Amino acid sequence: MDVIKRFMLFDKTILVSVISAKELVDKAIKIHSLSRTAAAALGRTLIVGAYMGTELKDDKQKLSITINGGGPLGRIVVLSDYGAKVRGYVENPAVELPLNGKGKLDVGGGVGKNGYISVIKDLGLKEPYSGRCPIVDGEIANDFAYYFTVSEQQPSAVALGVLAADNECVSAGGIIVNALPGA
């Protein structure tokens, strides 16, 4: 069962969110026939989208995430709404790259490093909030840590992981640590 748990630490100056998303990523793999590299990239982005969706306040609010790093996977787009209902796609779902020098999936090579992350939040105001920042390394976790710190002024550490086999998700989840005001 997928779940997001949040914990306040150190006199409520640190928020830790732990996300389990195996079912979400497994469904995406099956719907889009994702390669392992595409599954890792889209899965990591879906996890962040679900996390960000939990911050929306009512069912009229929604957000979109676009990652465009110029890599062979193409754009990654994720939509989330109130209650962390999330969906997304990757432009080139069949792209599979050789393992990187550490023996891991080369998500950074698939996403690319020449581009940006864009987040648009429709909070029901006159104009949607739009944040954009450059991609750091294409591995998605570091890119969102940078995005949260620079664009949302919330210093963060982000760890995301997707373990994908042929046409299935073995495990998927993340940990997001945010420094709150006064930390």
Give the positions of each predicted feature.
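Interaction interfaces in information-processing and related assembly proteins
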Residues: 2-183
